[in-house]
Amino acid sequence: MTEKKKEITERLEREFDVCDKHILRINEALEGLGVNIPMSADCYSNLTTEQVRCIDQFIFRFSKLQDSMGAKIFRYILEYLDEDITALPMRDILNRLERYLIIPSADEWTYIRELRNEISHDYPLLETDVAAILNELFSKSAFKGNRHA
């Protein structure tokens, strides 16, 4: 293994460790939420302060996880594969990862990113919209027991 590949491997391992912590906190937030998922708009509007904290933690960690994967891990993987990604936009990076079968779908990753942006940027959304987006994100976060999900 070349020095460059060793360095990339070390960076990947460090980022995987960071992602594992985010996944742990996501799981803790989901456990602490204590509501049936999918969650109705009525359920969402009647959440306790602690449940809202769990949702906030979920959103924060989900965002951090996706940022870490998109900004670092995906790029490191392609670097390791000797891909020139210097000036590539995120969509092209996702397409290459899909081609290598590293992610199942570039479109799905983009869709999840858009959902995450909607929920995390405090746009004025109806409670039904917030509940629907949260349910969709919850369904995309089945991390229990997965290392490097």
Q: What residue ranges belong to the model's regions?
A:
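Solvent-exposed interaction patches of small proteins and small membrane subunits
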Residues: 2-149
